[in-house]
């Protein structure tokens, strides 16, 4: 849930948004159809069932299908061997934004457009890692410049009760972590931090669903091994 400070600013923000229809675009970094399976099994709250529409589900790094998945890093600077980092074949194997742009799947542009038109972006189940730096940077710059908000739902193993000081320190740390991983200029950084609302003690990760994790893991490893062997 949101702590009182963020709940107040959140409520003030959403008052200016029409609640006649809530359209969701889901951008997933997962290679599997997990999000589709979850969406199929969950039931909407009766109060919102007629208002919420899942418009699109975008797989940023593609899916486990005949086209293959996109595994790798964000840019050439994240490849340690500099003699290979700018080689076209290495880029076509390891640089995720390059693969999407060269294959012209249109996924990157569709995902950016989804971010552009959103009133609110919910970060859920993401590591904010450097290998997807372009996405965190794009999101941060856009939210800093436009009237959008970010709901940040981190995974926390420790959900024990905190006193007020601990809550403030915890929330400040989460906001800083989120903003730091967006690699923003000072003015954009200052603009985006008040727009990040951290969730505390959330149970969003408790779906109660059974997934064949090992099977999906094996598929990912197999495709990665095939790609690496093809470039050797």
What are these regions (language model features)?
Residues 109-232:
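SIR2/sirtuin-family catalytic core signature
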Residues 1-103:
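Extended, H/D-rich, highly charged conserved domains that either
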């Amino acid at each position: 849930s949101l702590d009182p400070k963020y709940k107040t600013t959140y409520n003030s923000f959403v008052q200016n948004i029409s609640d006649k229809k809530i359209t969701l675009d889901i951008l997933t970094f997962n290679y599997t159809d997990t999000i589709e399976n979850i969406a199929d099994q969950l039931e909407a709250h009766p109060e919102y069932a007629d208002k919420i529409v899942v418009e699109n589900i975008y797989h940023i790094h593609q899916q486990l299908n005949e086209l293959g998945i996109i595994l790798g890093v964000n840019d050439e600077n994240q490849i340690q061997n500099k003699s290979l980092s700018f080689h076209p074949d290495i880029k076509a194997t390891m640089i995720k934004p390059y693969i999407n742009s060269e294959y012209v799947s249109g996924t990157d542009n569709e995902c950016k457009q989804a971010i552009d038109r959103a009133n609110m972006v919910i970060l859920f189940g993401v590591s904010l890692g450097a290998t997807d730096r372009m996405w965190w940077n794009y999101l941060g710059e856009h939210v800093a410049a436009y009237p959008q908000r970010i709901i940040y739902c981190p995974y926390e193993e420790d959900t024990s009760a905190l006193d007020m000081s601990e809550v403030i320190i915890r929330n400040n740390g989460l906001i800083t972590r989120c903003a730091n991983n967006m690699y923003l200029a000072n003015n954009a950084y200052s603009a985006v931090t008040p727009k990040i609302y951290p969730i505390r003690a959330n149970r969003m990760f408790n779906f109660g669903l059974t997934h064949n994790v090992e099977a999906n893991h094996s598929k990912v490893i197999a495709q990665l091994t095939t790609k690496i062997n093809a470039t050797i």
